[in-house]
């Protein structure tokens, strides 16, 4: 060990180049002989949970960490040599460039260990890496010395030397900004000219004659294939920049043998790719800005609606620049886009058309979002809800959450103050008779706190008094851990019981329909008038659900009806997460939920997004626990 090495109070090591399947247990087994370990964390992608290829190992004593660094660097774990270095949490020290050198033109056989062994003679190395892709070494690497003096010695002694019979370049590391600045300066003084589109009959001599009038040329080359046939492009290298600039100015765009030739500054492949990428990003940003607030996403479209019909339905709200129904194999995919000329027109269309029945289905209309925006929005919503759950002393449980084998429940997300309190299915079973609701109209108290419901005149009893005195009812602990309980599947609501259980009062609707069937709960004693047969959502073992049935139900029952049909479908995809996902999806508009019940593809897409959000949250919690354990902060 090097006694002059700097002190690292955290005694934390960075372990890179890990095999994707390497786990914390494997790393513990590898590093524990060096000394007592506080914690190990393999860093993973928040969404996919796949290893990012590096980890942190925190020792109790810096001496143990240094021993591991000296004796275990480049040891093999699961067939891959790992790269170990001190964990430097201050990015300014890592990115300063002090002591960092760049080596290029390396032989393919040179790996991290060989590079380390070669340069360790010049001083203490903090990190060393040969850059690789899926095909192996890319021929260059970096060595970061502890001191600038060691780096300068390495440059002086090794630059131009042979390494595995190849002459290597060793120089000071330059940041991308520095390299781009140098590249820009060189570009202004270019002497090499690129010419293309001159046909197959051009050779070196003709090209030299064509460009020789602008000044003396160092070299002229027409690129050819194996048979000696011209590829249609070539290069001319002038002695002076002024001659090259004059050739570009005069020859670019001129006709040669009936073809318009291109003449410009010769660029390296990296330069061309960078410029193309910048142009593409600029075009993408311009397109996003142009359509911001004017492009609408329309789904739950009837199969008979085409581009013309879609344009016709939305044309009363303003000037439409484009209307497109997405097709697959000549059949509608059930969604499309309408682009207006101004944000005001688009906003008006969303307000008027969202929920309106066109043909046989209620439309879902919203401003179009990119996939990244939707996922970011969902993730943000979920994180906010979880934060509010932790703030609640006794969170209540989602009614669609089954009792998993582990005995852990996910607390329901508290909504606005007038939303219903959710209970576990076993509690709901205790609070009501075996049928869902009796013919006498008795309804359990927990649902009386939903929007639009009539609250009793008497003061509502406290939450604790509403819990039946039964040992079978689980107590909701602050840690969200409860005993394993049996769940009762909630069946469909019979029509007669629904009518008897619903008070004949005016309530605020949560769902919007066309004039013929809009707000039917304002006249609950009359039969809703539906002019055409509406498609019904069939879930095995349950009553078919149509848009008119949903509209005729009071607002507080609509989510319940949708949830009972969503839960078994989601349970078939993700049995252990069905309750959490159902609770998340019930936050979506009713029209979109109906469409998801009719379209398995749409449902699966939303379920996948919800799963991604859950995984991201779990990853964040796991990372927080790892940080807490490393710093000694107790976790709750």
UniProtKB/Swiss-Prot annotation:
GO terms for cellular component: cell leading edge; cytoplasm; cytoplasmic stress granule; lamellipodium; ribonucleoprotein complex; spliceosomal complex. It comes from the Eukaryota. The modification Phosphothreonine is found at residue 319. Residues 11-89, 99-175, 191-268, 294-370 form the RRM domain. The modification Omega-N-methylated arginine is found at residues 455, 460. The modification Omega-N-methylarginine is found at residues 385, 419, 432, 436, 475, 481, 493, 506, 518. One of its GO terms (biological process) is positive regulation of nuclear-transcribed mRNA poly(A) tail shortening. The keyword Glycoprotein does not apply. The modification N-acetylmethionine is found at residue 1. The modification N6-methyllysine is found at residue 299. One of its GO terms (molecular function) is RNA binding. Residues 166-289 are annotated as: CSDE1-binding. It is found in: Cytoplasm; Cytoplasm, Stress granule; Nucleus; Cell projection, Lamellipodium. The modification Phosphoserine is found at residue 315. Residues 542-619 form the PABC domain. Belongs to the polyadenylate-binding protein type-1 family. May form homodimers. Component of a multisubunit autoregulatory ribonucleoprotein complex (ARC), at least composed of IGF2BP1, PABPC1 and CSDE1. Directly interacts with IGF2BP1. Part of a complex associated with the FOS mCRD domain and consisting of HNRPD, SYNCRIP, PAIP1 and CSDE1/UNR. Interacts with PAIP1 and PAIP2 (via the PABPC1-interacting motifs PAM1 and PAM2). Interacts with PAIP1 with a 1:1 stoichiometry and with PAIP2 with a 1:2 stoichiometry. The interaction with CSDE1 is direct and RNA-independent. Found in a mRNP complex with YBX2. Interacts with TENT2/GLD2. The RNA-binding domains RRM1 and RRM2 and the C-terminus (last 138 amino acids) regions interact respectively with the PABPC1-interacting motif-1 (PAM1) and -2 (PAM2) of PAIP1, respectively. The RNA-binding domains RRM2 and RRM3 and the C-terminus (last 138 amino acids) regions interact with the PABPC1-interacting motif-1 (PAM1) and -2 (PAM2) of PAIP2, respectively. Binds the poly(A) tail of mRNA, including that of its own transcript, and regulates processes of mRNA metabolism such as pre-mRNA splicing and mRNA stability. Its function in translational initiation regulation can either be enhanced by PAIP1 or repressed by PAIP2. Can probably bind to cytoplasmic RNA sequences other than poly(A) in vivo. Binds to N6-methyladenosine (m6A)-containing mRNAs and contributes to MYC stability by binding to m6A-containing MYC mRNAs. Involved in translationally coupled mRNA turnover. This is Polyadenylate-binding protein 1.
């Amino acid at each position: 060990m090097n006694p002059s090495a700097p002190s690292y109070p955290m005694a934390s090591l960075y372990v890179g180049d890990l095999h994707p399947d390497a786990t914390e247990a494997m790393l513990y087994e590898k590093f524990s002989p060096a000394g007592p370990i506080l914690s190990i964390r393999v860093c993973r992608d928040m969404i996919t949970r796949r290893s990012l290829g590096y980890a942190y190992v925190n020792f109790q004593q810096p001496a143990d960490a240094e021993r591991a660094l000296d004796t275990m660097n480049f040891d093999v774990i699961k067939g891959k040599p790992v790269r170990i270095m001190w964990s430097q949490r201050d990015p300014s020290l890592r990115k300063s460039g002090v002591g960092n050198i760049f080596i290029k033109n390396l032989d393919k056989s040179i790996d991290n260990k060989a590079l380390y062994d070669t340069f360790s003679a010049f001083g203490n190395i903090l990190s060393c890496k040969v850059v690789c892709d899926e095909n192996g070494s890319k021929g260059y690497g970096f060595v970061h010395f502890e001191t600038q003096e060691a780096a300068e010695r390495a440059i002086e002694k090794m630059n131009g030397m042979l390494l595995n019979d190849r002459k290597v370049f060793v120089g000071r590391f330059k940041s991308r900004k520095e390299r781009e600045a140098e590249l820009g300066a060189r570009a202004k003084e270019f002497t090499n000219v690129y010419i293309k589109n001159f046909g197959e009959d051009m050779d070196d001599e003709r090209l030299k004659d064509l460009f020789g009038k602008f000044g003396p040329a160092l070299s002229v080359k027409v690129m050819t294939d194996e048979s000696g046939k011209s590829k249609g492009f070539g290069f001319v290298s002038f002695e002076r920049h002024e001659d090259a600039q004059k050739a570009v100015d005069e020859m670019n765009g001129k006709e040669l043998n009936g073809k318009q030739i291109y003449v410009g500054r010769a660029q390296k492949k990296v330069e061309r790719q960078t410029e193309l990428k910048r142009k593409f990003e600029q075009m993408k940003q311009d397109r996003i800005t142009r359509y911001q607030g004017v492009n609408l996403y329309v789904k739950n479209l009837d199969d008979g609606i085409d581009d013309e019909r879609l344009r016709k339905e939305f044309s009363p709200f303003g000037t439409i620049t484009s209307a497109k129904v997405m097709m697959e194999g000549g059949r509608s995919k059930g969604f499309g886009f309408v682009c207006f000329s101004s944000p005001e027109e688009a906003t008006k269309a969303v307000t008027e058309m969202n929920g309106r029945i066109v043909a046989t289905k209620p439309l879902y209309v919203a401003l179009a979002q990119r996939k990244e925006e939707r996922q970011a929005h969902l993730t943000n919503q979920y994180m906010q809800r979880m934060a509010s759950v932790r703030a609640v002393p006794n969170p209540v449980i989602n009614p669609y959450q089954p009792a998993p084998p582990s005995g852990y429940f996910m607390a329901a997300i508290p909504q606005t103050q007038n939303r219903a309190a959710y209970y576990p299915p076993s509690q709901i079973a205790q609070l009501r008779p075996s049928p869902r609701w009796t013919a006498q109209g008795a309804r359990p108290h927990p649902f009386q706190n939903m929007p639009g419901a009539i609250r009793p005149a008497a003061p509502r009893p406290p939450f604790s008094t509403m819990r039946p005195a039964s040992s079978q009812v689980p107590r909701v602990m602050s840690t969200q851990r409860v005993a394993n309980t049996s769940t009762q599947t909630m069946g469909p609501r019979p029509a007669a019981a629904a009518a008897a259980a619903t008070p004949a009062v005016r309530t605020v609707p949560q769902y919007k329909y066309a004039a013929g069937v809009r707000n039917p709960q304002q006249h609950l004693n009359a039969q809703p008038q539906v002019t055409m047969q509406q498609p019904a959502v069939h879930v095995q073992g349950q009553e078919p659900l149509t848009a008119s049935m949903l509209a005729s139900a009071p607002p507080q029952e609509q989510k319940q009806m949708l949830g009972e049909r969503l839960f078994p479908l989601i349970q078939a995809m993700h049995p252990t997460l069905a309750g959490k996902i159902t609770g998340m999806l019930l936050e979506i508009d009713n029209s979109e939920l109906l469409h998801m019940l009719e379209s398995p593809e749409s449902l699966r897409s939303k379920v996948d997004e919800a799963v991604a959000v859950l995984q991201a949250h779990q990853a964040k919690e796991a990372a927080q626990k790892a940080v807490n354990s490393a710093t000694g902060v107790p976790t709750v």
